[in-house]
């Protein structure tokens, strides 16, 4: 009888120590399977925009063309595919929703920049840049929240 109880206790401890964590499993799938499917689109879109913004700015026409023909279509495709990712656990669903919101805001900011350039409205361009920076901040917040969730569930990102 004592052997059975000892065995049950040992197995219980092992199960608790090595048991499956559904959030951990969900995070591993999200990071290793789902995000790599969409990340290249985001990178290509942001790189296209960066190639005509800031220190790389040359003309409104060049910026308009690059955003309209490359950055926005790729970012729209990215946002659509990002929304299609459906994490299994509420914890990751909440963090993923932050990313979707940030991506949608960034996509809208790209559209707003196009409209402002088309109208040649300096005030709208300034507002669009503020919106783009706000979306970037939301993406950084998502990254921090994702890292925190990973830490909480013993997922190491290399």
State where each predicted segment sits.
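Sec-dependent signal peptide cleavage junction
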Residues: 18-25
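Alpha-helical segments in soluble extracytoplasmic regions
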Residues: 26-98, 102, 110, 117, ...
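N-terminal hydrophobic targeting signals that begin at the initiator methionine
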Residues: 1-2
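Sec-dependent N-terminal signal peptides
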Residues: 5-14
């Amino acid at each position: 009888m004592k052997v059975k109880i000892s065995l049950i206790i040992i197995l219980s401890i092992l199960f608790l120590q090595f048991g499956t964590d559904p959030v951990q499993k969900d995070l591993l799938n999200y990071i290793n399977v789902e995000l790599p499917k969409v990340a290249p689109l985001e990178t290509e879109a942001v790189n296209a925009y960066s190639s005509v913004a800031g220190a790389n700015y040359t003309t409104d026409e060049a910026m308009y063309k690059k955003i309209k023909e490359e950055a926005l279509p790729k970012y729209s495709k990215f946002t659509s595919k990002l929304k299609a990712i459906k994490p299994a656990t509420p914890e990751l669903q909440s963090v993923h929703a932050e990313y979707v919101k940030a991506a949608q805001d960034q996509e809208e900011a790209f559209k707003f920049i196009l409209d402002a350039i088309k109208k040649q409205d300096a005030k709208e361009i300034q507002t669009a840049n503020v919106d783009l920076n706000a979306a970037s901040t939301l993406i950084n917040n998502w990254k921090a929240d994702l890292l925190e969730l990973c830490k909480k569930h013993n997922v190491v990102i290399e």
